Amino acid sequence: STPPEKGPSEEELSELLARLVYSTMAAMPNWQIVSESEVREVGQSIPPGADMARLRKIGEMVYADALIVGRVERYRERIGNEWGAKSPASVAFALNLIDVRRGDVIWSARFDETQKALSENIFALGQIGQRGIRWLSAEQLTQEGVRKAVGELHQILVRGTAAS
């Protein structure tokens, strides 16, 4: 028998979340975004760690007002295909927007979903228009969550109701 497929590493998941957040944000109007590669390059010149001082330093070096930081909490791939899944995709992640000057979190979002069959969740009828009647991969589910979170952040910032 073949060994079970090993899922993506923590680093690969971080890169996936960063790529999805960046591409989603870059597609929206009214804000300037520092390229993912520039942030990564600057980040390599600063000693590793996830502390606020390091994040603020990266933000200052790329002349950003704020940084968005993500953390993948769960990433389980669907077992089966889009028309029949033995086990659905399950994804959880958190995003925090950090004010570079003050060093505090000014917005956060959390996405946590395990896709359910329509027969299990009649309230999912509203999602059919967006997803169709199919089982999403973990990456597709992550993309959907990123779109929701970034869309919410964009509305808040464009309306100017975020803390300043």
Regions found by a protein language model. Name each.
Residues 1-73, 100, 104-108, 144-159:
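N-terminal segment of the mature soluble domain
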Residues 13, 83-86:
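Short, glycine/charged-enriched secondary-structure capping and boundary segments
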Residues 58-62, 85, 98-164:
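C-terminal/domain-edge helix-coil "capping" segments
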Residues 66, 89-91:
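Hydrophobic core residues within well-ordered beta-strands of beta-rich domains
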Residues 77-82:
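Extracytoplasmic/secreted cell-surface and envelope-processing proteins
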Residues 92-96:
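Conserved beta-strand and immediately adjacent loop positions that scaffold enzyme active sites
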